[in-house]
A protein has these predicted regions:
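Short hydrophobic/aromatic beta-strand element in the GNAT-like acyltransferase core
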Residues: 41, 71, 103-104
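Conserved short beta-strand elements that form part of the metal-binding/catalytic scaffold
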Residues: 30-64, 113-120
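N-terminal beta-strand motif that seeds the catalytic metal site of vicinal oxygen chelate
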Residues: 1-20, 68-72, 120-123
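Mid-chain, well-packed structural core segment of small domains
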Residues: 70-84
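Core segments of cupin and vicinal oxygen chelate
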Residues: 4, 10-49
Length: 123
């Protein structure tokens, strides 16, 4: 089944409007003009992120302990972190990286651990 790809990623939030505002206005995702009732959908370039009503619960005894619920690729991590700072988003571990990528992790308003990652382009 090599033609499989992710269609929808769902995140839970007790305050759906505040969390949708965060993904639209802070992260910069495009909110689709139509969505299913109270479940906002964001375009991820052929896949979708939807915010569902509910209480997010972190994994118990997780290993590693700070692995994100979802990681979103960005072209310019420096610009993305500046945008997060401008909106008062705490980034508890700062910008991290290795030879292949750089990333920053933070919590959305619902408490979901999210990561923005920039992959290093090699010529």
């Amino acid at each position: 089944m090599s033609d499989l790809r992710i269609a929808v990623v769902g995140l839970w939030a007790e305050d759906v409007p505040a969390t949708a505002h965060f993904y639209r206005d802070v992260i910069g995702l495009s909110l689709l003009a139509h969505h299913h009732g109270e479940r906002p959908h964001f375009d991820l370039g052929g896949s979708y992120l939807t915010i569902l009503k509910g209480r997010p619960v972190p994994a118990q005894d997780a290993s590693p302990p700070h692995f994100p619920v979802v990681a979103l690729a960005v072209e310019d991590l420096d610009a993305a972190t500046e945008r997060l700072r401008a909106h008062g988003v705490e980034m508890p571990w700062g910008v991290e990286g290795d030879a292949q990528s750089r990333w920053v992790k933070f919590y959305d308003p619902a408490g979901n651990l999210v990561e923005l990652v920039q992959f290093e382009h090699r010529a």
